[in-house]
Amino acid sequence: MMHNRALRSFSKLARHDIRDWVLTGGLAIELRLGVEPASRPLNDIDFIVNAFDCIPRTLAGDLIFRHIHPFDPPGKTLLQSVDPDTALRIDVFRAYGATIRRASPMELPFGRFRVIALEDLVARAARLALDIAVGVPVPSKHARDFLRLVALVDPNQVETAWRDHRKPAHPATFDEANSLLHELIPARPDLLITPEYSKDTEAVCPRCAPTQAMHLADPNAVLGLLEYC
């Protein structure tokens, strides 16, 4: 059974033209793993799109916006919004390479929806977890998700997706990245952290660029809903 909050937010999103959106993030991970999504703590719903123009301006009638980044590159946040009725964050990211084309439809409680491919979820988790290779702390969920997901795939089938997701300094092949992470994750538990989110309502985001139809919410309103902003 899916979280009731998620169902309510998806029902709201269904009022808008989100045909170009692909579900990713924690919900997609649980769906691809064949696990009931309600078993995972739900803090946000993540999507990917190819361009900012894929985000309908009509969302302004149902959501409030914390970050609006029309010019962010692949992998980065285009929109961070909040459903004020469910206090769920709804994030939209710019997709890497051919990620959108590799997505496939799934029948979900809120209707038929495209979900990111398992191979892309593995490649994305590997990209994020590999920060520990250079001594940078990483949210522990990325390492945990990587280990759960990679156990279900043939590493050879991830190579194409890996070329889209890897950073320039990362191993050239997924096989190498996979081996490296299986060494690093158990060796560096000190770098696997639980992140703390900002509560600074005075902070100014240099990447935000509100549009005529989409305006930034009062940070205090976001803080009241999420307990961070």
For the regions a protein language model found, what residue spans apply to each?
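Compositionally biased terminal segments of proteins
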Residues: 1-229
